[in-house]
Design a protein with these regions (language model features):
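Conserved catalytic core of nucleotide-sugar-dependent glycosyltransferases
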Residues: 120-187
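A structural signal for well-ordered alpha-helical segments within the folded catalytic domains
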Residues: 15-18, 92-96, 188-196
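Residues that flank catalytic or metal-binding motifs in active/ligand-binding sites
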Residues: 94, 113, 152-155, 190
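Conserved hydrophobic/aromatic beta-strand scaffold that supports enzyme active sites
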Residues: 97, 156-158, 233
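N-terminal anchoring/stem segment of glycosyltransferases
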Residues: 1-80, 103-107, 161, 236-241, ...
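GT-A fold catalytic core of metal-dependent nucleotide-sugar glycosyltransferases
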Residues: 90-141
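Extracytoplasmic beta-rich repeat domains
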Residues: 86-88
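Catalytic core and acceptor-binding pocket of nucleotide-sugar-dependent glycosyltransferases
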Residues: 161-266
Length: 267
């Protein structure tokens, strides 16, 4: 059984989250449900496949973390400008939600998907499941050979909830925040803390994970849509894509663009 989770605040729900959930319900199989971890918003959706959580009630550690650490510096402000790589506040909601779901889900496979995504075709479930072999505890979108963004793209993550080390991972991941260790890292963005926790579990337990982009990666511009995910889903990363309502054809690598342009969504 597969389960999905996402997170958003009130403005995010109105700008892109509602569309994400509506297109999820339209295209994903009927036996796949989605858990919404909501920050100060109620969606009003009445559908048995949609389970809504107040993130502050469901993830009790988040309040203390925010009360202790929510300041300009920890929001990534450097020299008067925000640098997302050092933002330990905005992205912490994703982390606490993922750790809660890992520990409380009864599914076999858990997918974290960013709320600024759109599903435009039926997901190939069997092919998706092949991205996460039984002996791997997580699968992710890597950015190998990217010196500017030397960490995973965490708009999509898969978790094998039947793996013996998956709860070791959630413990390490959440511990980075509850202990303040996140502030000792080179970067505080969740992409880097995910990589840190993943590598810790790999090194400590000999566990395996899968970079779905392969050893050479899938470019620096927009690896999400260049994976198999781009055949049924779009990730509206950044203000420009959100304003346009979709990603750009130029986001595709040349060898992938031709196939994508056969789909109505990308034309």
């Amino acid at each position: 059984m597969i389960e999905v989770l996402t997170t958003f605040h009130k403005a995010g729900w109105e700008q892109y989250g509602k569309r994400m959930v509506e297109t999820f319900l339209q295209h994903w199989p009927e036996d796949v449900c989605i858990h919404l971890y909501c920050e100060n918003v109620q969606t009003g959706i009445k559908n048995p496949r949609v389970i809504e959580h107040d993130i502050f009630e469901t993830c009790p550690h988040i309040k203390g973390y925010l009360e202790q650490n929510n300041n300009d510096h920890n929001n990534g402000i450097r020299n008067g400008k925000r640098d997302f790589k050092y933002d330990a506040i905005k992205f912490c909601y994703k982390v606490f939600a993922q750790c809660h779901r890992i520990n409380h889900s009864e599914a076999d496979t858990l997918l974290f998907i960013d709320a600024d995504t759109v599903t435009f075709a039926t997901p190939p479930i069997e092919q998706l499941q092949e991205l996460l072999p039984d002996d791997n505890f997580t699968a992710y979108i890597g950015r190998p050979n990217n010196n500017k963004l030397p960490f995973a793209e965490t708009g999509f993550i898969m978790y094998n909830l039947r793996h013996p080390n998956i709860k070791n991972f959630s413990e390490v991941f959440e511990d980075l925040y509850t202990t303040g260790k996140v502030f000792d890292l080179e970067y505080q963005v969740d992409c880097f803390t995910y990589d840190t926790a993943r590598r810790t579990v790999e090194q400590t337990h000999g566990a395996k994970s899968n970079d779905i982009t392969g050893p050479e990666g899938l470019g620096k511009r927009h690896p999400f849509v260049n994976t198999i995910l781009g055949t049924f889903m779009d990730h509206l990363k950044g203000d420009d894509r959100k304003a346009k309502g979709k990603s750009n054809v130029d986001d595709f690598k040349d060898r992938i663009k031709k196939d994508r342009l056969t789909q109505d969504y990308w034309k």
